[in-house]
Every structure is written in C-alpha cells, then in structure tokens.
Amino acid sequence: LGAIGAGDIGDHFPDTDPKNKNLDSSAIVMHAIRLAIEKKLILNNLDITLLLESPKISDQEYKITMKRNILEMFFEVFHICCPDIISKTNPRNIFTDDMINIKASTSESLGFIGKGQGVTCYCIVSLKNLNNEH
C-alpha cells in the first residue's frame, strides 16, 4: 500500500470493522496488488525480511513455498484485472520467482521476538509501469 501511496492497512481494513477480525492476510495482499494494477503499476521486485526465532526459515523448501504462494496471488489478481493483457502474455512471464527475495534473521534471544512471542516482517517493494510490460 505504501509503494502506491494508498495509506496503510487500517485505512482499508479498519480493526473496528468486525468483518476484518481474523482476516486472511492474503486478502490484504491481493487488495494491494489490485490497487497497484489499477494505477498501472506491477511488481518489479519484492524483498522480504522475516525477524523471528522459529520456525527456522533457512530451509529452501519453505522459502520456495512462500514465493509460490505470493506469486499465485499476483497471478490470480492479474487474471481478474487484466484480461486484455492475459490474452497477449502469460502472467507467468511477467511475474517470476526471481523477483521475490525472502530472508530471515533472529533477534538473538532479545526482546519479545527473541522470546518467541512475536514475529516482525519488513518488505521493500519496487514497482514498474504496467504499460512497459506488454
């Protein structure tokens, strides 16, 4: 949302709205993807850093699964929002797993994260103009 100047999660999914209680986070991600596409912007690069004690994210299979799930959200929204482009280009040629980097670190047992009481995620999103892709 920040990469497209669309405020924050609370602007779109207020915690005062009961329907947002226990909302699947993929709904938030897909909403942000749709808003970006409406502004003619698509993913250039996504860099994710997870800060947690467990589970250990160093396992490549876990990272591959996370990337696959993220890419599937892009494909699903792109199919809905861009049928004209889909007719010309396979979105799997537009969104590839090398556009997403996932890494993890611990807080070396410090603070609430180090005690296993929470997780932090930092993301940097780079977008590009959709019109340059097809």
Regions found by a protein language model. Give the residues of each.
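Divalent-metal-activated hydrolytic enzyme cores
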Residues: 46, 132-133
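Glycine- and Gly-Pro-enriched alpha-helical subdomains that act as flexible
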Residues: 1-41
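Short glycine/serine/threonine-biased micro-segments
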Residues: 3-5, 109-116
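Functionally constrained cores in energy, signaling, and assembly domains
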Residues: 32, 36-39, 93-97, 126
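Hydrophobic residues within well-ordered alpha-helices
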Residues: 29-32, 70, 123
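C-terminal edge-of-domain segments
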Residues: 115-132
